[in-house]
C-alpha cells in the first residue's frame, strides 16, 4: 500500500530568519537504554551521490510517463517513505527521505541555505505526522518507481510503505523491507517482473519467513537486476578511474549466512546475487577492510580491478590539484608569453646596440612595453571588479557604485604604476647604456602630485609645492633657452623619445580612427611641445607616464561606453572629448563647473580675494567621488609638457559638462574673467589632490565591502530577505499542510533519530547536521540524535547545542550565524586563505 502526499509548501509558512523558537538538545545516538521510549527514525538520502544507471529501457521498453526516474529527480521533489507497521517495536516509527541537495550559491547564500533547510523541514514534517494523515489518495505499487506529479515552485512529496527497524546489537544494524503488492497500473505482477533499475537505497533485503514465495521472487529478481547492472558498469568503465560508485550494503546481525527459499523463476538470478555478495564479503575480510557488524562499504571498480589485474590494486584517486592546475595554467601561459617577449626584445636591443644602432631596437622594446602594459592594466581592472562582485554580491550590481569604485581603484593603482614605469625605464637605460643619472632634483616635481592636499588647513604646504614646481619649470625653460642649437641627444634620451613618440602617435591614430572628427591642430601642437623636451631622464620618464595615463584613460572610456550618461549624450564620439570641446567653443565659455573653472584658473591664474567663497561652495556641493578621481587624472595629463592644450581643455570640458548634467546640485553661472585671473592659489591646492585622500577613499570602500560581506550586523541581510519574501508570496499556501504544520509546531514531539546516507565532505556533513538541527528545533523536537558518525565529524555538535541553549539562541539567530560563517568562508576563498575553520569549530568560537 502506497501513501501519496500531495504537493507541499509548508516551509513557506515559516519565517526562518525571525523565528523565536528555542533550539532543541542534540546528542549522538547510542542504542543502549532507549528501547522503551517513543521515538522517530528518519534516514535522509541524497540521491545525487548515488550513481544510478538505468538499463531497463532496452529490455522492458521505454519508461512510462507515470514512473519516476531517480536520476532525474528535481531539486524541488522529495520522496518520503514511511513505516506503517510497527510489529517488533511499537514505539518506533521509521521514515526514509530521498532528496537532491542543492548546489552552493555564492551570490545568494540565504536562498541556498533555505533550499536545503526546507527539504529537511518537509522530511521532519511528514515523519512526525501520524501515518493516516499523510494519505491523500492511493495508487498502485510501481516497484520502487513512484507516480510523478509535475511541480514548479513547490515541493512534491511521495510516500511509500516500508518496514524500517533499528536493532540493538550495533549502532548501524539496519533492516529495510520493501512492501510488495500487485501492480494495477502496468498490468504486471511481481511473479513475472521485467528488468527494473535497482532501488536507490542499494539495500540487500532479508525478508522474514512470513513472506510468500512470490514476494521472495520479487526481491531476488530486483537484487539480480542490481548485480547485472553492476557487472555491465564494471565492464564498461575498464577501470578508467572516473565516476566511482560507492555502495552501502546493510545487513542484520545473525542473518548474513541465512539463505531464503527461492522460486523457480528467480533461482539463477538469486544464485548470482548470493555469489557476488559472498565474494565481496570474503575479499573485504581478507584485506582487513571489514567494517562494523551490520554495515559494509566497498568500491565496485576496485573489486573489478582486483579480479582482472591480479595483486595490483588501484584506487584511482581524483587529483586534488587538478582545479588549482587548471586555474594556474592560463596565468603561466600568459606570464611565459610576456617574459619571452621581454627577453627577446632585450636580446635584440643588446645585439643591435653592439653594432651602434640603438634606434630600431628601442622601437621593438617600446612595442612590447606598451602592448603588455595595456593588457596587464586591463586584466587587473577586470579581475578586481570580478572579485569585488563575487564578494559583495548585490552591492556590485549598482552601476553607479561600480563606476565610482572602478575609477577610484584605477586612480589608486596609478601611483604605484607610475613608480614602476619610472623605475623600469631607468633600469633599462642603465642596463643597456651604462649611463648614470645626472640629477635627481626634478623628482621633487612628482612628489607634488602625491603629497599635496586641497585641505584648507594644509594650504601653506600646497603653496610651497606650487612654488617648487614653478621654480623647476623656470630652470627647465632657462636650460632650453640657453642651448638654442638643440644639442645632440644621448642614447638614453633617444630611447625615451622614441617610446614617447610612437606611443602618442599610436594613441592619436586610434582616436582618429574611431572618432573621425579630430581637429588638425592637435598634431602640430604635439610637435611643437615635443621640440621643448627637457633633456633629462626624469622629465622623459614623466612624459612616458603621461602617455600611459592617456592610453589607460582611453581604454577605460572604451570599456564604459554605453554605461556612462556622458557617453550616451555623445554617441558619435568614442572618447567624448572633441565634441564637448566644439560645444564649448561655440558657447564661448559661458558655462562651467568645478573642472572647467579649474582649467580656466590653470591657464590664467593669479591669486584673488574670492578664495574663501570658492572653498565654501566646494564643501557645500560635495563633488561626487568619480568627478574628483577623473579631475586628478586630467590634472596629471595637463601637467605634462607633451599634452596638447586643446586636448587637455577638451578633457576637462567633457568631464565638466557631463558632471554638470548628471549632478543637479552643481550650480552653473557665468565666470568673470577678472575673477579667473585671481584664483591661482586655490587651484594650486586643487592640483595637489594628495595621495592620502585617495588612500583613505579606497580604504573606506574596501571596509564597506568587508562589512557587508561579513554581515557584521543582523540587518545586513535585507537584500536577501526581500528575495525570501518574494519567494514566500509566489503562490497560495496549501491549507491542509499549513494546518498540519501549525499543529505540530505547538505540541512537543517525540525524540528523533537521524541517519544521513550521503557521501559528502566534512563541511557539507556538518552543515547538513546543523540545518537538520534547526529544522527539528522549529518542530519542537525535545531531543535529536545523530547516528552514523564514524569519522567523528559531529562529536562537537552536542557541545554546540548546549552552548546555544545556554546563551538563549533561537532558530532565527542560529540560522543567521550559519549565514555569517558561509559569507566569511566565501571571503576567505576569494582572498586565497586556505586555513579555514570547520562549521562546528566556528560556532563554538562565535556563539
Swiss-Prot record:
Chief place where the protein resides: other
Highest taxon of the lineage: Eukaryota
Tissue: Expressed in flagella of epididymal sperm.
Molecular function terms from GO: protein kinase A binding
Location(s) in or outside the cell: Cell projection, Cilium, Flagellum
Region of interest: PKA-RI subunit binding domain: 334-343
Pfam entry (one): AKAP_110
Residue(s) carrying Phosphothreonine: 206, 505
Biological process, per Gene Ontology: cell surface receptor protein serine/threonine kinase signaling pathway; establishment of localization in cell; establishment of protein localization; flagellated sperm motility; protein localization; sperm flagellum assembly; spermatogenesis
Record PTM Phosphotyrosine, positions in chain: 300
Family indicated by similarity: Belongs to the AKAP110 family.
Domain notes: RI-alpha binding site, predicted to form an amphipathic helix that is required for binding to Prkar1a.
UniProt protein name: A-kinase anchor protein 4
Organism: Rattus norvegicus (Rat)
Amino acid at each position: 500500500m502506497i501513501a501519496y502526499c500531495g504537493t507541499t509548501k509548508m516551509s513557506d509558512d515559516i519565517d526562518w530568519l525571525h523565528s523565536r523558537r528555542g533550539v532543541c538538545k542534540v546528542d549522538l545516538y547510542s542504542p543502549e537504554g532507549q528501547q522503551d521510549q517513543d521515538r522517530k527514525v528518519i534516514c535522509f538520502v541524497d540521491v545525487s551521490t548515488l550513481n544510478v544507471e538505468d538499463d531497463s529501457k532496452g529490455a522492458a521498453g521505454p519508461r512510462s510517463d507515470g514512473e519516476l526516474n531517480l536520476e532525474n529527480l528535481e531539486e524541488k521533489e522529495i520522496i518520503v517513505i514511511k513505516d506503517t507497521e510497527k510489529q517488533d517495536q511499537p514505539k518506533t516509527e521509521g521514515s526514509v527521505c530521498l532528496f537532491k541537495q542543492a548546489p552552493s550559491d555564492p551570490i545568494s547564500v540565504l536562498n541556498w541555505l533555505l533550499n536545503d533547510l526546507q527539504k529537511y523541514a518537509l522530511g521532519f514534517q511528514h515523519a512526525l505526522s501520524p501515518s493516516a494523515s499523510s494519505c491523500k489518495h492511493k495508487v498502485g505499487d510501481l516497484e520502487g518507481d513512484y507516480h510523478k506529479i509535475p511541480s514548479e515552485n513547490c515541493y512534491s512529496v511521495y510516500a511509500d510503505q516500508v518496514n524500517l527497524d533499528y536493532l540493538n546489537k550495533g549502532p548501524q544494524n539496519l533492516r529495510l523491507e520493501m512492501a510488495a503488492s500487485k501492480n494495477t497500473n502496468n498490468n504486471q505482477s511481481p511473479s513475472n517482473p521485467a528488468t527494473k533499475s535497482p532501488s536507490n537505497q542499494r539495500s540487500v533485503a532479508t525478508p522474514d519467513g512470513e513472506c510468500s514465495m512470490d514476494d521472495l521472487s520479487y526481491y531476488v529478481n530486483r537484487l539480480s537486476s542490481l548485480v547485472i547492472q553492476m557487472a555491465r558498469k564494471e565492464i564498461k568503465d575498464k577501470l578508467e578511474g572516473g565516476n566511482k560508485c560507492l555502495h552501502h550494503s546493510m545487513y542484520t546481525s545473525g542473518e548474513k549466512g541465512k539463505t531464503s527459499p527461492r522460486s523457480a523463476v528467480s533461482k539463477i538470478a538469486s544464485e548470482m546475487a548470493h555469489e557476488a555478495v559472498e565474494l565481496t564479503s570474503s575479499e573485504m575480510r581478507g584485506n582487513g577492510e571489514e567494517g562494523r557488524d551490520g554495515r559494509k562499504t566497498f568500491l565496485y571498480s576496485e573489486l573489478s580491478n582486483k579480479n582482472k589485474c591480479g595483486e595490483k590494486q588501484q584506487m584511482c584517486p581524483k587529483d586534488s590539484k587538478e582545479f588549482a592546475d587548471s586555474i594556474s595554467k592560463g596565468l603561466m601561459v600568459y606570464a611565459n608569453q610576456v617574459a619571452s617577449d621581454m627577453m627577446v626584445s632585450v636580446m635584440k636591443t643588446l645585439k643591435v646596440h653592439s653594432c651602434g644602432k640603438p634606434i630600431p631596437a628601442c622601437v621593438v622594446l617600446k612595442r612590447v612595453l606598451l602592448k603588455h602594459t595595456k593588457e596587464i592594466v586591463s586584466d587587473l581592472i577586470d579581475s578586481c571588479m570580478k572579485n569585488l562582485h563575487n564578494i559583495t554580491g548585490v552591492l556590485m550590481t549598482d552601476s553607479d557604485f561600480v563606476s565610482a569604485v572602478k575609477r577610484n581603484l584605477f586612480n589608486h593603482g596609478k601611483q604605484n604604476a607610475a613608480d614602476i614605469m619610472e623605475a623600469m625605464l631607468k633600469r633599462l637605460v642603465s642596463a643597456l647604456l651604462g649611463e648614470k643619472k645626472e640629477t635627481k632634483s626634478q623628482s621633487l616635481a612628482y612628489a607634488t602630485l602625491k603629497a599635496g592636499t586641497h585641505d584648507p588647513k594644509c594650504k601653506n604646504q600646497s603653496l610651497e609645492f606650487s612654488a617648487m614646481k614653478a621654480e623647476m619649470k623656470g630652470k627647465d625653460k632657462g636650460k632650453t633657452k640657453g642651448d638654442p642649437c638643440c644639442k645632440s641627444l644621448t642614447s638614453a634620451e633617444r630611447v625615451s623619445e622614441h617610446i614617447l613618440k610612437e606611443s602618442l602617435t599610436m594613441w592619436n591614430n586610434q582616436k582618429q580612427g574611431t572618432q573621425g572628427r579630430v581637429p588638425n591642430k592637435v598634431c602640430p601642437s604635439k610637435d611643437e611641445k615635443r621640440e621643448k623636451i627637457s633633456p633629462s631622464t626624469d622629465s622623459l620618464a614623466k612624459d612616458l607616464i603621461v602617455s600611459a595615463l592617456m592610453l589607460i584613460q582611453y581604454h577605460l572610456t572604451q570599456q564604459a561606453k554605453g554605461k556612462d550618461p556622458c557617453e550616451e549624450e555623445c554617441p558619435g564620439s568614442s572618447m567624448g572629448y572633441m565634441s564637448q570641446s566644439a560645444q564649448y567653443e561655440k558657447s564661448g565659455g559661458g558655462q562651467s563647473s568645478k573642472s572647467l573653472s579649474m582649467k580656466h584658473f590653470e591657464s590664467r591664474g593669479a591669486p584673488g580675494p574670492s578664495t574663501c567663497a570658492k572653498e565654501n561652495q566646494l564643501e557645500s556641493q560635495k563633488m561626487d567621488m568619480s568627478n574628483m578621481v577623473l579631475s586628478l587624472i586630467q590634472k596629471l595629463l595637463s601637467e605634462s609638457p607633451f599634452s596638447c592644450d586643446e586636448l587637455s581643455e577638451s578633457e576637462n570640458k567633457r568631464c565638466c559638462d557631463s558632471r554638470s548634467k548628471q549632478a543637479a546640485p552643481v550650480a552653473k553661472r557665468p565666470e568673470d574673467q577678472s575673477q579667473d585671473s585671481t584664483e591661482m592659489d586655490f587651484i594650486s591646492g586643487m592640483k595637489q589632490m594628495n595621495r592620502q585622500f585617495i588612500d583613505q577613499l579606497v580604504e573606506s570602500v574596501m571596509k564597506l565591502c568587508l562589512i557587508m560581506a561579513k554581515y557584521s550586523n543582523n540587518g545586513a541581510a535585507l537584500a536577501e530577505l526581500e528575495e525570501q519574501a518574494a519567494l514566500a508570496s509566489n503562490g497560495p499556501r496549501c491549507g491542509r499542510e499549513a494546518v498540519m504544520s501549525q499543529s505540530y509546531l505547538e505540541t512537543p514531539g517525540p525524540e528523533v533519530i537521524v541517519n544521513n546516507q550521503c557521501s559528502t565532505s566534512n563541511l557539507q556533513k556538518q552543515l547538513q547536521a546543523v540545518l537538520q538541527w534547526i529544522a527539528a528545533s522549529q518542530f519542537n523536537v525535545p531531543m535529536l540524535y545523530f547516528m552514523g558518525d564514524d569519522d567523528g565529524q559531529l562529536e562537537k555538535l552536542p557541545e554546540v547545542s548546549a552552548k546555544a541553549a545556554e546563551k538563549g539562541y533561537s532558530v532565527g539567530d542560529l540560522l543567521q550565524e550559519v549565514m555569517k560563517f558561509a559569507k566569511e568562508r566565501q571571503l576567505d576563498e576569494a582572498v586565497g586563505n586556505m586555513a579555514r575553520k570547520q562549521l562546528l569549530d566556528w560556532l563554538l568560537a562565535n556563539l
